[in-house]
Amino acid sequence: MGLGQGGGLAQRGTFAEGLKNDVVVVALSPGRRHLTKPVCEITYGIRESGIQTSVQVLNAGSGLPADAPNSLGSTFGLKPEEVEQVNRHKLCIIHFGNVKSHVVYKARLFLRFVTILTIVVCQTPIDMEDFAKIGIKTADVIPIEPKTKGTIVEIVTGVVRGESSPQSKIDEIIEKIKKHLK
């Protein structure tokens, strides 16, 4: 386990469990390009709204999955214990970043193992069809050949990594969480 730049907020491999296993917010490994700042603010906002929330910062959350096109450098992956920790919850919120191709391939690897409903938060404009094209199950678009166990139920775009999240985005995330926790 190494230390990464997290804006002083979190380090890779961190897992902080809430009192109830309702929601888990997942952040990529902190580093030069993946700062956990928006994830920490989102988590704080969710907790302030009265929803029990856990936090998981992935140990190998930077880079691309090995099966992604043009995958060079560091490799995105999940440890079995991270998968187990996430799957104990009812709903997952994960922030994937800004590069569209990275977002979809990371989501596919993540949801191969994570079986719970997932809300994707990212900076780049993206829709359910972008995920379904590579086999990710979504609430709105069913892929021809599903390659994931988990399902994307909502997408929130425009959340910039390393920057403060506008209250409107935090409110949007909370609204979508409440819709799926009923």
Curated annotation (Swiss-Prot):
Transmembrane segments: none annotated. GO terms for biological process: methanogenesis. The keyword Nucleus does not apply. Keywords: Methanogenesis. MCR is composed of three subunits: alpha, beta, and gamma. The function of proteins C and D is not known. This is Methyl-coenzyme M reductase operon protein C. It comes from Methanococcus voltae. The gene is mcrC.
